[in-house]
Every structure is written in C-alpha cells, then in structure tokens.
C-alpha cells in the first residue's frame, strides 16, 4: 500500500508533512490489497474532525458522561391520541473553540461504535431511560420507553443483563422497556439476533427491529430469527 502526498516546503513543515504521510498511508491500507491513495485535503480535515470528536467522547465517558443527554420522542396511540410511551434518543455536545457545539448522531454514534464507547454510553442511556420511565408511570400507567441497541452492544456486551439491571433498579415490569435493535454496520447479524431474541423472550422483554430492510434484515433472515 502506498500513500502519496505533494510535499512543498517540506523542511519548514516537516512535522505536519509527517502526520499527513502517516494519514495517507493508513488511507491506502484501508483500501485493501496494494492500494494507492493520493492525499486529499478534505479527507484530512474530516479525519481531524473525527479524531477531535473521538477525544471528546472519551473524555465525556470518563467524566460521568458530561456532554451526553437523552431526549425523548413521544409515542402516541393513533386511536386515542394519547401518549403511551417515548423513544430515548442519545445526544452529544462538546466545546470547540470555547463554544458549545452539538454533534449530529450521524457523526458521533458511528464513532462510539468504532471505539467501543457505545457500550458504556449505551448503559448510561438505558439507566436514564429507565429512571424517566419510572417517573412517567406515576402519571401514565402502562407508559413504556424504547431504547436503541447497537450491533456492537449485541456482539460485545451482555446487553440483556444491562437491560435487566436497569429494569430491576427502578422496579419496572419487563414490558415497560422495548429494545430497538439496529443493524447498521454489520452484514450478517442473524446469530446475534437469534441469541438475543431467546434471552429477551425468557425475560419477557419486548424488542423490535429498527431500520428494517436496510442491512441484514431481509425476510429470509427474519425467518431464521
């Protein structure tokens, strides 16, 4: 693999060119085989932005999830018009140049998955959602909350144990929490879904498939699950 850069004024800016050369080589290797990558400034700017967000995410997770918030999107019964639940949505903001900047979930969630930080961050969301559900059930009997579960959580953590822990901590019935299983980022999640489905059935935890049909979840695989 080969990374190619156009080096002008190399001696004056050696450190910067060294970083760019390392970046270009990594890009070439990521292409597979004997890939050749020609340095693009926009690619490098995007890379630096991602590294900055990753650093902020690591800091937030180790600092009691400062910068993370959970928003709730109401779930409404169409027949009655009443609110019967909510979907928990993870949000993240960080300081950049002294100003608070909200980062799109499209940007930060893949980075959480890439770094494995989605596991502790996911537990944070679960706990926050369970606490909110406990409070809301005092006013709306039967209120439930939907929580998105990443494929990384399915593969690399005992997510069903995390869900049970949150349910038990707030003395909630199992049906009060519904896991939305997302499939993005992995092509064949069938074995993991099957195992998780069995665990959920045993513990009477509801689950649904999010973004149905965008990845592994064609009808053939659904039959297997």
Question: Whereabouts are the PLM-identified features?
Answer:
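Residues at or immediately flanking beta-strands
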Residues: 1-3, 35, 67-69, 142-146, ...
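Nucleotide second-messenger and two-component phosphorelay signaling modules
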Residues: 31-32, 62-65, 77-79, 98-99, ...
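The catalytic core of metal-dependent phosphodiesterases that act on cyclic dinucleotides
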Residues: 165-225
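Catalytic core of bacterial c-di-GMP phosphodiesterases, primarily the EAL and HD-GYP domains
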Residues: 6, 17, 46, 80-84, ...
């Amino acid at each position: 693999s080969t990374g190619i850069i156009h080096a002008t004024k190399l001696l004056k800016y050696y450190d910067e060119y060294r970083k760019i050369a390392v970046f270009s080589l990594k890009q070439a290797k990521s292409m597979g085989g004997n890939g050749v990558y020609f340095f693009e400034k926009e690619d490098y700017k995007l890379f630096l932005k991602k590294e900055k967000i990753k650093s902020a995410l690591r800091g937030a997770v180790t600092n009691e999830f400062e910068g993370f918030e959970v928003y709730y999107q109401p779930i409404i019964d169409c027949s009655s018009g009443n609110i019967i639940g909510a979907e928990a949505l993870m949000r993240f903001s960080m300081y950049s140049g002294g100003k608070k900047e909200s980062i799109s979930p499209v940007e930060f969630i893949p980075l959480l998955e890439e770094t494995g930080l989605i596991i502790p961050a996911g537990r944070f969301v679960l706990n926050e959602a369970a606490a909110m559900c406990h409070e809301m059930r005092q006013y709306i009997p039967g209120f439930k909350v939907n929580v998105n579960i990443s494929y990384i959580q399915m593969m690399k953590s005992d997510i069903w144990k995390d869900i049970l822990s949150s349910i038990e901590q707030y003395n909630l019935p199992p049906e009060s929490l519904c896991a939305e299983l997302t499939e993005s980022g992995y092509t064949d999640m069938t074995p993991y879904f099957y195992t998780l489905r069995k665990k959920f059935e045993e513990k009477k935890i509801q689950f649904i498939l999010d973004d149905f049909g965008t990845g592994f979840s064609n009808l053939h695989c659904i039959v297997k699950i």
